[in-house]
Amino acid sequence: MRKIKKAIIPAAGLGTRFLPATKAMPKEMLPILDKPTIQYIVEEAARAGIEDIIIVTGKHKRAIEDHFDNQKELEMILQEKGKTDLLEKVKYSTELANIFYVRQKEQKGLGHAIYSARQFIGDEPFAVLLGDDIVESDNPAIKQLIEAYEETGKSVIGVQEVDEAQTHRYGIIDPLQKFGRKYEVNEFVEKPKQGTAPSNLAIMGRYVLTPDIFDYLATQGEGAGGEIQLTDAIERLNRADQVYAYDFEGDRYDVGEKLGFVKTTIEYALKDESMHDELVEFIKKLKLN
């Protein structure tokens, strides 16, 4: 069985929920404290043993490439001023993994974005990490899926429980037999209508896929929202060759919408010893209804 050493991070979306901030800045570069959200995703992949990452970009995404590239002039200035802590942080972001880029020329959905990276992946199994979900866990979420793949040799989809009222926002699994945190899946349903979801186990932005998925993406028609949905291709793969779901451990932060982004920023700030006490005092003084 081939080891998983490659990952895809889709980052071609327009980020319309964060306009006008994302008119000129990629959504993935919006910071949680002092790091852009996409760096948290790359760090998770690196901690899981991923060596090569391809980021699928679109127009106006050059800032992502610049962030993970060497900035020699900046490094020299920091070195001369003795700001070694900042220098190490700047250099760290360039040393996480081998990072490559491919452009999704048309906004045709997540499935199309993944298909855009097929030449980079070749015939290897690979990981997918979506940028809207930051996951905090001792064992990285994607590493948990890789370990499940190593047990089964099959594609593994990361899931977590959500409130039943929110199931229409996600891809949902119809689970069959359960093995610990791993499920056999009867069906994958993309964004079911309210009240029709087969469970409350939602697909949460982490995947380990065999290269067979590209055969299904190549012929996948439009699905929900008029886009080529990855979930639909996974469901077709599941009919031909068992796909598993894995209820991964970890705290998930939704940074793909404004309220979740604010909550994440506050929680991360409270974890930072340098600002915790002052932030707590500030929150206490707010006139909250």
Curated annotation (Swiss-Prot):
Tagged with keyword Nucleotidyltransferase: yes
Catalytic reactions on record: alpha-D-glucose 1-phosphate + UTP + H(+) = UDP-alpha-D-glucose + diphosphate
CDD domains per the UniProt record, alphabetical: UGPase_prokaryotic
EC number: 2.7.7.9
InterPro entries in the cross-refs: GalU_uridylyltTrfase_bac/arc (IPR005771), NTP_transferase_dom (IPR005835), Nucleotide-diphossugar_trans (IPR029044)
One GO MF term: UTP:glucose-1-phosphate uridylyltransferase activity
GO biological process: enterobacterial common antigen biosynthetic process; UDP-alpha-D-glucose metabolic process
Protein biosynthesis found in the keyword field: no
Pathway where it operates: Glycolipid metabolism; diglucosyl-diacylglycerol biosynthesis
Keywords in alphabetical order: Carbohydrate metabolism, Nucleotidyltransferase, Transferase
A Pfam family recorded for this sequence: NTP_transferase
Similarity section: Belongs to the UDPGP type 2 family.
Function: Catalyzes the formation of UDP-glucose from glucose-1-phosphate and UTP. This is an intermediate step in the biosynthesis of diglucosyl-diacylglycerol (Glc2-DAG), i.e. a glycolipid found in the membrane, which is also used as a membrane anchor for lipoteichoic acid (LTA).
Matching NCBIfam families: galU (TIGR01099)
Protein name: UTP--glucose-1-phosphate uridylyltransferase 2
Species of origin: Staphylococcus saprophyticus subsp. saprophyticus (strain ATCC 15305 / DSM 20229 / NCIMB 8711 / NCTC 7292 / S-41)
